[in-house]
């Protein structure tokens, strides 16, 4: 989580909200990285509630929805997503070899829909219904696919 948060802090000029369950040790790490921490007491109900909680506390003009278990995403990939949002993109999806990855950027047009998310599908439904508004950006970054779910996953990535 620390590696993911640190990269996002750099790419997003320090404007990072980390949404997590109530875990004092994790919260301390995130605050030390420079994140604003929001507690999601409904985290057990799925990723959608975490996205909704993070969007609700920010007056942002767009969001890069990133997962804490994807520390291999490069800073320049996140910067490219941020720049596309600033240039007027509605949704920005990084791709490599024709496959979609993470993180995904959403403009302020999606505030209400992001705030109403629930369940464990995250923003996937928005991507399905609004695919015609998604800008795909090609990146040379396999990190957009790599998540760490177990200690073995971490060993494979190193």
Question: Model segments located where?
Answer:
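Nucleotide and nucleotide-moiety/phosphate-recognizing core
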Residues: 1-100, 108, 132-139
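Residues that form generic nucleotide/phosphate-binding pockets
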Residues: 29, 84, 113, 117, ...
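Short, glycine/charged-rich beta-strand-loop motifs at protein surfaces that mediate ligand recognition
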Residues: 68-69, 110-118
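Conserved protein kinase catalytic core
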Residues: 75, 113, 153
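Internal, well-ordered alpha-helical segments in soluble enzyme and binding-protein domains
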Residues: 77, 110, 119-123
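Short glycine- and hydrophobic/aromatic-rich loop-to-beta-strand nucleating segment
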Residues: 102-106, 146-148
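Conserved alpha/beta core of the MobA/IspD/sugar-nucleotide pyrophosphorylase nucleotidyltransferase superfamily
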Residues: 116-158
